[in-house]
Regions:
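K/E-rich alpha-helical interaction surfaces of small helical-bundle regulatory domains
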Residues: 82-87, 109, 151-154
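Solvent-exposed, flexible loop/coil residues
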Residues: 70, 75, 112, 120, ...
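Bacterial N-terminal signal peptides that target proteins for export
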Residues: 1-9
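Signal peptide processing junction and immediate N-terminal pro/mature segment
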Residues: 21-23
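Surface-exposed, charged secondary-structure patches
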Residues: 102-143
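Bacterial N-terminal signal peptides
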Residues: 8-18
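Early exported N-terminus immediately downstream of N-terminal targeting peptides
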Residues: 25-104
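Short beta-strand edge/turn micro-motifs at domain boundaries
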Residues: 142-155
Length: 155
C-alpha cells in the first residue's frame, strides 16, 4: 500500500488532466471525480480483473483524462520537443500512455475501503483550474492529491 501511495502522489501531483471536450462539458472537479470513480471501480474489481484486465480497464480512462501530448511536451521540454520528429513525438506520447496505464494497473491492485474526496476547486494562472482532493486510506489516513486542468485545446 505504501508504494501505491507514493505513486498516487507523484502521478496526481505531476500530471495535467482534462481534455478540451471534457472541459467544455464538465467542471474541473467533475473531470477529476470521474477519474477517481473509475479508479475505485477498478480497485474493487482488481482481483477478478488481474493486471491485464486492469490495464484494459484503465487505458481509455487515462487517454480521456490526461492530456498526454501536453505532458510529453512538458516532460521533454519545449525546446527539445521542437527538435523531435513526428515519429519521435508519437513514440514519447505512446510511452507515457503505456507507463501511466501500467502504473495505475499495478498500484491500484486492490480495495481496502479507500475513497477519494474533492476538497476545493480554484482558478489558477493562465486559465487553469487547480483541484485539491484527498485519498482516504482504509486505515483512515489521508493523502493529498493535486490536479491542474488546462482549458481549451491545451487541455
Amino acid at each position: 500500500m505504501q508504494r501505491r501511495i507514493l505513486i498516487v502522489i507523484l502521478v496526481a501531483f505531476c500530471l495535467i488532466i482534462g481534455s478540451a471536450a471534457q472541459a467544455a462539458e464538465k467542471s474541473a472537479s467533475e473531470v477529476v471525480n470521474a477519474l477517481h470513480a473509475s479508479l475505485l471501480e477498478m480497485m474493487k474489481d482488481a482481483d477478478a480483473l488481474g493486471f491485464d484486465g486492469r490495464s484494459k480497464f484503465i487505458e481509455p480512462v487515462v487517454t480521456k483524462s490526461f492530456n498526454l501530448p501536453l505532458i510529453a511536451v512538458m516532460a521533454a521540454g519545449e525546446k527539445n520537443w521542437k527538435t523531435f520528429s513526428k515519429a519521435q513525438k508519437k513514440q514519447l506520447i505512446a510511452a507515457l500512455e503505456d507507463l501511466s496505464v501500467a502504473t495505475y494497473a499495478a498500484r491500484f491492485d486492490g480495495y481496502s475501503g479507500e475513497n477519494f474526496r474533492t476538497l476545493s476547486e480554484q482558478p489558477a494562472d493562465q486559465g487553469t483550474t487547480y483541484v485539491s482532493t484527498e485519498l482516504t486510506q482504509g486505515d483512515g489516513g489521508t493523502i493529498p492529491l493535486k490536479y491542474l486542468l488546462y482549458p481549451g485545446d491545451s487541455g
